[in-house]
Amino acid sequence: MGKKYIESAKLIDKSALYNPVEALDLTLKTAKANFDETIELHVRLGVDPRHADQQVRGAVVLPNGTGKTVRVLVFAKGDKAAEAQQAGADFVGADELVQKIQSENWFDYDVVVATPDMMGIVGRIGRVLGPKGLMPNPKSGTVTFDVAKAIEEIKAGKVEYRVDKTAIVHCPIGKKSFGTEKLKENFTALMEALVKAKPAAAKGQYLKSVSVSSTMGPSAKVNPTRALD
């Protein structure tokens, strides 16, 4: 454990539950790396991800974006391919892109969008895209005929969230350079989306624990009952 991390960790009371603004302030104070660290939100949910009816997955456009340049690959043909190019997609194609991914193990993109009619060919690389979280999905709005809107939202700061095997959602909410106010707006947008996505089958306390941290820094716990303050 580095010296900077140990010094930073002293500023945060591990037993305390902060309100969102306090937690974000502390996270920014403890982000001491010499690059613009990403600020992440971690939420443990009262769900059992082993059950299909307790999956939590979706997407939300963060009001202040992510601070990251997102490269979008679109599987589309004809008019939809032209629409995707016009909307600012970084890569557009069909079979030739599937071949490139298969033969070159090519991953120079961050999000994959596909029109529904292309899912047959995209399915051929599902085993490659799936483990990297790149497989297009209707729930996250990445399988759609409205490719222009999908690209626009992704470029504007749309993030996907998905509960992992341990019932935790990890999601970036911006960069250190955003400052507390912008990060708080993004934090709230994501928390509201998670609450709306609560499965009907989830019983008991839904927000089990909430915390924020920077790429290299310690985490600050947020009081789950105040997470939407």
Curated annotation (Swiss-Prot):
Among its keywords, does the record have tRNA-binding? Answer: yes
What's the name of the protein?
Large ribosomal subunit protein uL1
Keyword terms: Repressor, Ribonucleoprotein, Ribosomal protein, RNA-binding, rRNA-binding, Translation regulation, tRNA-binding
- What is the gene name? rplA
Question: What InterPro entries does the record point to?
Answer: Ribosom_uL1_bac-type, Ribosomal_uL1, Ribosomal_uL1-like, Ribosomal_uL1/biogenesis, Ribosomal_uL1_3-a/b-sand, Ribosomal_uL1_CS
Q: Which GO terms describe its molecular function?
A: rRNA binding; structural constituent of ribosome; tRNA binding
Q: Does the keyword Repressor apply?
A: yes
Q: What does this protein do?
A: Binds directly to 23S rRNA. The L1 stalk is quite mobile in the ribosome, and is involved in E site tRNA release. Protein L1 is also a translational repressor protein, it controls the translation of the L11 operon by binding to its mRNA.
**Single GO biological process annotation from the record:** regulation of translation
